[in-house]
């Protein structure tokens, strides 16, 4: 299965940006941790990483995933979580599972950070676990996709499914 990991604004500065909140781990290290998690778990997962500081590029990347071989999206939209109805709309149009990740617990931060337009559009949100949150999202995504495939197989093999009885 192929999973797209989208990283939003300022995440390229992890390791330098407010270490009290975000720690010293860099974005490249987070991606390495995710790849190691895939290898150690013998997961049949291919990850593609994309980072941008531009809202429109995030929307473009989500739209490019429609009809592609990406089966799911893990996204940390950064501060766009709190402002971007456009990214939320793109997530809703993606037609695949999307999980939002935040390194910090946005509910414990400033008042303006507590609302997440994008999180409301996602199937789930994982926040406050630092870099571990990405592996938590990855495990959730793998399980969600496996359940979806099992359901689709069951429907395909169900003789009572009217779609299977069409000639």
Curated annotation (Swiss-Prot):
UniProt keyword annotations, A-Z: Amino-acid biosynthesis, Aromatic amino acid biosynthesis, Lyase
Coiled coil regions, renumbered to chain: none
Annotated substrate binding sites: 76, 82, 89, 103-104, 113
Residue spans crossing the bilayer: none
Biological process, per Gene Ontology: amino acid biosynthetic process; aromatic amino acid family biosynthetic process; chorismate biosynthetic process; quinate catabolic process
Site (Transition state stabilizer): 17
Active site feature: 22, 102
GO molecular function, one term: 3-dehydroquinate dehydratase activity
Signal peptide: none
Pathway per the UniProt entry: Metabolic intermediate biosynthesis; chorismate biosynthesis; chorismate from D-erythrose 4-phosphate and phosphoenolpyruvate: step 3/7
Function as written in the Swiss-Prot or TrEMBL entry: Catalyzes a trans-dehydration via an enolate intermediate.
Subunit composition and interactions: Homododecamer.
The protein, known as: 3-dehydroquinate dehydratase
């Amino acid at each position: 299965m192929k999973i797209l990991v989208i990283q939003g604004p300022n995440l390229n500065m992890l390791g330098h940006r407010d270490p009290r909140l975000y720690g010293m781990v860099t974005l490249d290290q987070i991606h390495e941790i995710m790849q190691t998690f895939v290898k150690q778990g013998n997961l049949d997962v291919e990850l593609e990483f994309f980072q941008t500081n531009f809202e429109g590029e995030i929307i473009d990347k989500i739209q490019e995933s429609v009809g592609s071989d990406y089966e799911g999206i893990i996204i940390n939209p950064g501060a766009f979580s709190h402002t971007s109805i456009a990214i939320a709309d793109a997530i809703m149009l993606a037609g695949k599972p999307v999980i939002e990740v935040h390194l910090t617990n946005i509910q414990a931060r400033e008042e303006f950070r507590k609302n997440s337009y994008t999180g409301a559009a996602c199937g789930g949100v994982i926040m406050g676990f630092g870099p571990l949150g990405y592996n938590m999202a990855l495990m959730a995504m793998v399980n969600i996709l496996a359940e979806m495939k099992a359901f689709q197989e069951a429907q395909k093999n169900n003789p009572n499914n009217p779609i299977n009885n069409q000639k």
